[in-house]
Amino acid sequence: MPLRDYNAAVDFVDRNVAEGRGGKIAFIDPQRSLSYGELRDAVARVGPMLARLGVEQENRIALVLKDTVDFPILFWGAIRAGIVPVLLNTRLTADQYRYLLEDSRSRVVFASSEFLPVIEEAAADLPHLRTIIAVGDAPAPTLQLANLLATEQEGGAPAATCADDIAYWQYSSGTTGMPKGVMHVHSSPRVMAENAGRRIGYREDDVVFSAAKLFFAYGLGNAMFCPMGIGATSVLYPERPTADSVFDTLRLHQPTLLFAVPTLYAAMLADPRSRTETLPDRLRLCVSAGEPLPAQVGLNWRNRFGHDIVNGVGSTEMGHLFLTNLPHAVEYGTSGVPVDGYRLRLVGDRGQDVADDEIGELLVSGGSSAAGYWNQRDKTRTTFVGEWTRTGDKYHRRADGVYTYCGRTDDIFKVSGIWVSPFEIEQALMSHAKVLEAAVIPAEDTDGLIKPKAFIVLASRGDIDPGALFDELKEHVKSAIGPWKYPRWIQIMDDLPKTSSGKLQRYLLREMTLGGIEATESAPSEPALYGRVVAGNGR
């Protein structure tokens, strides 16, 4: 554990230089690379620059940045100066940014050039905000990061911070409600780097590529904390990743570790290039998190590329991965075992511990737990209970300690008096060759009884026989997981509703169903809550 007097930036940046890695490449983006020594020099100049802008220790600055080498410069530069970077999603609307900037009371916003118009709209007349700085080219009189840093001839000394000082914020994406500012302390990155780093097996000579972005907790741990914790190299990709761009990046940089979300792995398998493309010879491990990995995606990946995908679980509140498959013992359909350094519990509705082979809410204890939510005392007390952090996820634990995801606490429902996991039905549907994605919710039949309803995205579009497809999928699910769990209705969608971080928004599907919205062939394709009812009568 870090000492009481501790600055995370000194540990992750200065230490690498002191240990002889000053000339080693820390980050690579499409435009340039940055050695650990160059990173240290740039990071040291950020504090004096922020001071000239009127930002004081413990103030907050907002980062709305693409994944380029400027991200670690500003992130660690602020932390080194005792200033708190607030990492914001780059895919939001002006109203959403305004809420986050008001809530965080950020003094300065650093935004990649293409985001300036929406940030300027969001920031109009905000009382706490002093200025907006462009990262990249921008027309006068907009201030530019490169020019401001160039005027700083000498770096400043690191701030006198302690391990329990707030280091950075991220906002929980959530699937409902307003985002919450999750506050992490200076000691948290080191805990994440050591715990998750050991489980994944990071090495100093690794080249890491994370398709998950740095503003996400998953991406921040993958591409920043874990590789920097051991002195490895990260490849950054600034644009939104696609199957094509990931294949290109793998071919160009030949990484040893690949991190992505299940949706991207599925998209890569569905892309025509997957039939001819090979993975880099030196690629050692593929990791998935951000949402549960469907077993069929993992199996298809193994069959096509000869690599397993390690399924991992983390959260914004815990910072990074706390539960994963063991890299040498992947078991698809499960979430694996706790990462060393974390303890897990399953509890029932009254907070009592549940036995093996029962379903309960997952609680986590570990040194990377957030300090709480900003200005959300009631929600902080509900989520952070003593040493335990409530995840809101339902899990099943076997006697051998292996955990399996069952859904969110408000997703589980009973059919014929038996608890049903929507995720289990979704996995069964996605194991069928014609189904790319699936979401399952409870719906009432004509007798008022609860039955599963499925929404699916087809693997390939074209003419279908609705009745035949429904019968085919129904029998497939019944044979896979049980005769009472099959969906009584199936609806085809162009896309499933998701948050900007890729999490499925089942509540929107529930609202549509409860609202009595009947989708038809003539319904609009946007928003994505309309599609074709394939078949089903609730029986």
Curated annotation (Swiss-Prot):
GO biological process: secondary metabolite biosynthetic process
Alphabetically ordered keywords of this record: ATP-binding, Ligase, Nucleotide-binding
UniProt-listed SUPFAM superfamilies: Acetyl-CoA synthetase-like
Uppermost EC category: ligase
GO molecular function: 4-hydroxybenzoate-CoA ligase activity; ATP binding; benzoate-CoA ligase activity
EC assignment: 6.2.1.25, 6.2.1.27
Catalytic activity, reaction form: 4-hydroxybenzoate + ATP + CoA = 4-hydroxybenzoyl-CoA + AMP + diphosphate; benzoate + ATP + CoA = benzoyl-CoA + AMP + diphosphate
InterPro entries (alphabetical): AMP-bd_C, AMP-bd_C_sf, AMP-dep_synth/lig_dom, Benz_CoA_lig
Covalent S-S links between cysteines: none
Domain of life: Bacteria
CDD domains linked to this entry: BCL_4HBCL
pH-related activity note: Optimum pH is above 9.
Modification after translation: The N-terminus is blocked.
Self-association state and partner proteins as the record states: Homodimer.
Function summary: Catalyzes the ligation of 4-hydroxybenzoate, benzoate or cyclohex-1,4-dienecarboxylate and CoA at the expense of ATP. The enzyme shows low activity towards cyclo-2,5-dienecarboxylate, 4-fluorobenzoate, 4-chlorobenzoate and 2-methoxybenzoate.
Family membership: Belongs to the ATP-dependent AMP-binding enzyme family. Benzoate-CoA ligase subfamily.
Name under which the protein is recorded: 4-hydroxybenzoate--CoA/benzoate--CoA ligase
Species: Rhodopseudomonas palustris (strain ATCC BAA-98 / CGA009)
Top-level taxonomy: Bacteria, Pseudomonadati, Pseudomonadota, Alphaproteobacteria, Hyphomicrobiales
